[in-house]
Amino acid sequence: MSADFRHEPVLANEILELLRPRPGELFLDGTLGGGGHSGLLLEAGARVIALDKDPRALAAATARLARFGEAFRAVRSDFRDAKNVLEALGIAAVDGALVDLGVSSPQLDEAERGFSFSRPGPLDMRMGDTGETLEDLLRRIDERELARILREYGEEPFARPVARAVKAALETEAPLDTARLAEVVAGAIPRKAWPHRIHPATRTFQALRIAVNDELGALAAWLDGLPGVLAPGGRAAAISFHSLEDRMVKEKFRALTQACTCPPDLPVCACGAKASFAAITRKAVKASDEEIARNPRARSARLRAVEKLR
């Protein structure tokens, strides 16, 4: 296997502690990537069905994990379709489910994928090789919609001037690559407002990547599908890397673990409802200082987990 897709799984020890894989149990890894988390589960004796949209990641991870034989199966699919994939395979439920919502290092580092602003690459940003590219998106939407995307998905305070500058550059400069796009974005933000620790285009690139891949829609679908995917006693874990994702996971997990559905002004519960899930993590689990020193990209990782009760 090419070394390009080898990566150190984030929060590896914490994942094993929370998911507690046992020999023979079946797990669903919704974001195979370099195969790091799937490898952890397989090493513990579990069986794994893994999904990924990226054919290169699938090929590389499949080669890496081939030694586990029939215990490992990779499927080219978006994790939003996890339930459909399991049904197609004749599987009613799994003992655990995991998603790692970060972009893999190879995707970030390969200029031709269009995720990096440090080197020139095409305006692509697709996790797979199908669907609308970033350039397609930028040409299809107007300045107002672009500003909304930057504000909502990137929490960019200068969304309007950035959107204006990007649309203007798209019309006057051809071809526009990722390095030049980053320069355009940075130029639209007052230098005194540049973030201290990240490139000024980071928020914009995050927002555009989320929009191109409908990442929040995929996460919402995965979260909504958990009750129908997990067997009783099954555990689910999600690793997020920015506040939008973490907020979605936190709110959905909270909703799953709540029992009473009565209006908040009722003094006594009248519905008699019982929670179908229990929280495993009371707050987000973060990487240790040692892991961050070894893998700086783990700094923003947030892990939350729940267990299905019935």
From Swiss-Prot:
Quote the InterPro entries the UniProt record gives: RsmH, SAM-dep_MeTrfase_MraW_recog, SAM-dependent_MTases_sf
Leading EC class? transferase
UniProt KW S-adenosyl-L-methionine keyword:
yes
Q: Give its E.C. classification number.
A: 2.1.1.199
An individual GO BP term: rRNA base methylation
Which reaction(s) does its UniProt entry say it catalyses?
cytidine(1402) in 16S rRNA + S-adenosyl-L-methionine = N(4)-methylcytidine(1402) in 16S rRNA + S-adenosyl-L-homocysteine + H(+)
Q: Where are the transmembrane segments?
A: none
Q: What keywords tag this UniProt record?
A: Cytoplasm, Methyltransferase, rRNA processing, S-adenosyl-L-methionine, Transferase
Protein origin, superkingdom: Bacteria
Does the entry feature the keyword Methyltransferase, yes or no?
yes
Q: Name one GO cellular component term.
A: cytoplasm
In the record, the note on similarity to other proteins reads: Belongs to the methyltransferase superfamily. RsmH family.
Q: What is the annotated role of this protein in its UniProt record?
A: Specifically methylates the N4 position of cytidine in position 1402 (C1402) of 16S rRNA.
Q: Which PANTHER family match?
A: 12S RRNA N4-METHYLCYTIDINE METHYLTRANSFERASE (PTHR11265:SF0), S-ADENOSYL-METHYLTRANSFERASE MRAW (PTHR11265)
Q: What is this protein called?
A: Ribosomal RNA small subunit methyltransferase H
What taxonomic lineage is listed for the species of origin? Bacteria, Pseudomonadati, Myxococcota, Myxococcia, Myxococcales
